[in-house]
Amino acid sequence: MGDYFAWDFANISGSNTSGSLNLNQLNLDNINNGLHNQEDGAGGRNENSERVGSGSPGSVSMQVLSLFSAVNSALATLEKSEEFPSVVKDEQSIFPAVAKASNSLDELAQNIIPAPSPPGFNRKRKTFDEDSSVEMIRRAISDHLDLLNNCCIGIANLNEDSVHKISLTRSGKPSQLVTVSCRHSSVIQKSYGSEKRYLCPPPMVYINGNYSSIFNQSFRTEISIMNDFGQCSQPISEEYTGQGCMIFRSLHISSLVAAKSKNLRLSLDMFSNVNNQLLSHLVTSSISIVSKPSKKGSKLKISNITLRSGSVVSLYNRINSQTVRTKYTSIEAGQFCLRGDRWVPLRINLLLPDENGKLKVCDDVDNPEPIKYGSIVELVDEATGTTSDPLIIRRVEKDHIAEEDGYVNQMHRIVLESAYPISNVRHLKIAEHSSLAYSNNISVRWFLGATSAQNRNASSEAILPIEWEAVGNLSSNEMTRVGDSVCWTIVGISHFDCTMMLPFNQNPVPTVTDYPYIEEPPEYLESSRSLQFKIGGYSVGLQIWLGVHGPLSYSFTAAADTSTMGTVTLGLSQISYDPSCAEQKYPLLFVIPGGIVIIGKCEILLTSSAFGN
């Protein structure tokens, strides 16, 4: 779900109308009065005969009264099912107090007092006659349209300051959009036997927007690792207290979950702390399982774990292979630093010299260049704009710098050497213990290091700077030996973002189904004037909208061995052409049965070309 698309398609004119069914309300009060008048005129009853029995007139009157009440409730439900068939199921689940229909007259007689009607089905029925659920969704989409289009442009740069900002809609009201973002490693190292292989870096979950509209004020997030067969590891729980970000440092993979699986996913469940109710269920993009990185062979082979220019990565430093002494790269006050409790995704850009010899970012988006060892790169934090000095990326083998060949793959152990003389670097300071290198008659090379940050007295919450550290050789022909303090493990980072909103003034219906997402770019089918695309997280009752147009007619063909993934063919005949607009952009939206609107992160561009204009 991390990719964003925009397509240019022809707009199709059409209209969609729906009728409504009106039923006269039964006057139960008049019926009740008539029954009592019949009983009063019968006469000849004593006190004992007034007791209601199974065959007495009083019993029959109560049965008939309850029967009329049940019929009235059923007719009201039938009217709504005719007028709003797509939301009846949701309304019944939202209002559990609706009386269950009975087939037996004796069962009806037990309900002397008719069950109260839910708020949406009162006698006047204002809520759904005057303001249907479809219209509420349409108005909410229209009010949030500018924000929805922005959601389709790209990933928001998240940090602990930005997650608390709530945008305003067209009407000036606070936005109801809520974004759940998960940043996690794109590979997991395989676990053998009973060992615990922790995810590095640990997954981080951001909550952005008016989260109380969907998740309530007090909730927790449970995250677990799920394999291809739906088996999950022991979940790790974190309370959300408005801090914007949750980090799951204890999450690890076991050999049982990873057995016979090629890919894993993270399962995120949000639960209310008030009643332990499931509020949301999300599944991230796939995570590849890799064995221990090979040190020989396939150096010149590009694989799915090869890093390219523009890849998003995380770097961490570990001393003596100890998990407790793992520090992650972060940004603080515009400076690169190390922390044990937080990390920041960084974009690694390949730098190539231009015709004037000046280093320039290789920014071929369509065909990003694979990064080879010995290349010059830079690290960029897009949230703050912080950029490193030019660095030469080199591989480490057996505590020595290896030859400059092969491609940079994830989970490799690397060093980052200054591409310029140390006097020309800008962003980082020189470590105090490295100042002695100037006074010795040895060949000195400068690397990014973590000696100060790995001080044993520093807490995991401490924020300590990354510094330049000198590594020297007594002979220029000698292989450079490096310690753990200047060695880094590089890992690719994947992201999962789900933006949603609830148009109704009520809590959503809990659902354990995956939220829908687009797997492949839509394709326009000119013959049928429709869009076709692959979807994941499909569930029965799903609605599909293009902006304010919806729900649109579509067909779903499930893939083999699954009911949640398949191909959707979406008709466009319900969308009317607007001659005042040369092109019309619509965000692709999903409405799940619980009433939550899910942003599909895909913008469809409709033009007038199919109409000959």
UniProtKB/Swiss-Prot annotation:
Keywords: Cell adhesion, Cytoplasm, DNA-binding, Nucleus, Transcription, Transcription regulation. Disruption phenotype: Leads to cold sensitivity, slow growth, and altered colony morphology. One of its GO terms (molecular function) is sequence-specific DNA binding. GO terms for cellular component: chromatin; cytosol; nucleus. Residues 32-58 are annotated as: Disordered. InterPro entries: Beta-trefoil_DNA-bd_dom, BTD_sf, CLS_fam, p53-like_TF_DNA-bd_sf, RBP-J/Cbf11/Cbf12_DNA-bd, RBP-J/Cbf11_DNA-bd_sf. Induction: Expression is fairly constant throughout the growth phases of haploid cells and similar mRNA levels were found in vegetative diploid cells. Its main location: cytoplasm. It is found in: Cytoplasm; Nucleus. GO terms for biological process: cell adhesion; positive regulation of transcription by RNA polymerase II; regulation of lipid metabolic process. Pfam families: BTD, LAG1-DNAbind. Transcription factor that behaves as a negative regulator of adhesion. Recognizes specifically the canonical CSL response element GTGA/GGAA. May also play a cbf12-antagonistic role in the regulation of a number of other important processes such as extracellular material production, colony morphogenesis, ploidy maintenance, or meiosis. Belongs to the Su(H) family. This is Transcription factor cbf11.
